[in-house]
Design a protein with these regions (language model features):
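Phosphate/oxyanion-binding active-site loops and adjacent basic polyanion-contact surfaces
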Residues: 112-114, 149-152
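Short glycine/proline-enriched loop/turn "hinge" motifs that connect secondary-structure elements
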Residues: 130-134, 209, 314-320
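Active-site/substrate-binding loop(s) of hydrolase catalytic cores
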Residues: 133-140, 150-276, 335
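Hydrophobic helical h-region of N-terminal Sec-dependent signal peptides
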Residues: 6-7
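N-terminal cap/lid segment of alpha/beta-hydrolase-fold proteins
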Residues: 104-115
Length: 379
């Protein structure tokens, strides 16, 4: 694989047109390129890189920044391909066949503690890849937060594939899908709820009550069960920061996080825990859970509690982003096809549900905490 330093060196000091390339660099470039052939066969690992990098244009008109960017694209695509191979192997062990990972245009900005890319896809309907769609509602779909809950991972990947397969169905809708928030836990044998540091990513968000309540809840309510360990401080884990990054960057109007095996829909957000006197905004936000339910064989909706450091607390309660937790009824991988048939209509309805809001300002008003536990909420 061409390394960044090699490309930059070639651009800055490369041979003049017609001059032979130094012998020690020649093996890095296909022979057909060196001969000036027009039908250059690009190796698999370079398929996403501009063909001109392999022709004579390599030494003509390409900037150092272009070369660095191309090298970075090669590196990222190679890491994504490696991850997809590992996911495919894990899928085969679960009798799921090949995953949808390698068929979709993932990207990543962070890696896990063990170096696995934290994948996401910013889907923008028929205008895929564009970011200038301010009128579009944005839905964030999360899977694999607790990877021992196997069925949500399958459902999240299949939903991403459905977006790709029928783009007209979701035209004018933006969906950001992160199907495997905790890859390290997924690749453990057996799969584990926590990440490699032993932290529950759904108890590690920097909620206002984290310093005062997270450890108390863990010790008293969970008897210090290591599967629910919230970490030594909030927002310490790559998987937690990854989810916060997605919320900051894409400003979602609604969030669907897929879990198992409790068997219900839980809503957190505007109007949660209110029995009457809801505003029209609160009513419309709460209706998101019931829309998903009606399109999923009337799956039951419960007003479940939220925990210190949880996504529902962080996004739904504190930042008023309508957040639905879809709890499948089993983690058994044999039910993956059943859950796809049952819940794809509900996920589709969630994306199409008209609800526009702005969270970006609230993201900057998150609670600030100190190691001593003092909390000061910015206005």
């Amino acid at each position: 694989m061409l390394q960044c330093g090699v490309i930059v060196s070639l651009v800055m000091t490369g041979p003049a047109q017609g001059e032979l390339m130094p012998k020690d660099l020649a093996p890095l470039v296909p022979v057909s390129v060196l001969s000036g052939a027009d039908d250059v066969s690009v190796p698999t690992e370079f398929r996403s890189v501009s063909r001109r990098l392999f022709g004579r244009e390599l030494f003509e008109g390409i900037s150092v920044f272009d070369a660095i960017g191309a090298a970075e694209a090669v590196r990222k695509n190679s890491r994504i391909a490696d991850l997809c191979e590992k996911i495919d192997a894990r899928y085969r062990s679960l009798s799921w066949g090949r995953s949808q990972c390698s068929t979709l245009p993932w990207t990543y900005d962070r890696v896990s503690e063990q170096g696995h890319p934290l994948l996401y896809w910013d889907y923008s309907g028929l205008n895929e890849g564009l970011s200038d769609l301010p009128s579009d509602e944005t839905t964030l779909v999360l899977g694999g937060v607790h990877p021992d809950e196997l069925t949500p991972i399958n459902l999240a990947f299949r939903f991403a594939q459905a977006l790709r397969d029928d783009r007209a169905l979701f035209a004018q809708h933006r969906v950001v899908v992160a199907p495997l928030v905790n890859p390290d836990g997924f690749f453990s044998i057996p799969a584990r709820r926590t990440n490699v540091n032993g932290v529950d990513l759904n108890r590690n968000f920097a909620t206002r009550d984290w310093w005062g309540a997270a450890w108390t809840w863990w010790k008293n309510r969970r008897q210090s069960d290591p599967r629910h360990f919230p970490g030594f401080a909030p927002d310490t884990e790559e998987g937690t920061r990854f989810q916060v990054d997605l919320m900051r960057r894409f400003d979602p109007d609604k969030i669907v996080s897929i879990h198992a095996p409790l068997g219900f829909l839980d809503y957190d957000g505007p109007g949660d825990n209110k029995r009457k006197n809801l505003s029209s905004f609160e009513k419309k936000a709460r209706d998101l859970a019931y829309v998903v339910s009606r399109n999923s064989n009337n799956y039951r909706v419960l007003d479940f509690v939220f925990y210190p450091g949880s996504l529902g607390n962080f996004a739904g309660n504190e930042r008023q982003v309508p957040t639905v937790t879809l709890e499948l009824s089993s983690t058994n991988p044999r039910f993956a096809d059943k859950y796809w048939r049952e819940f794809f209509p509900g996920l589709k309805a969630a994306v199409k549900y008209e609800f526009k809001r702005s969270v970006l300002a609230r993201m900057d008003n998150r609670a600030t905490t100190t190691p001593s536990g003092t909390i000061c909420c910015q206005d």
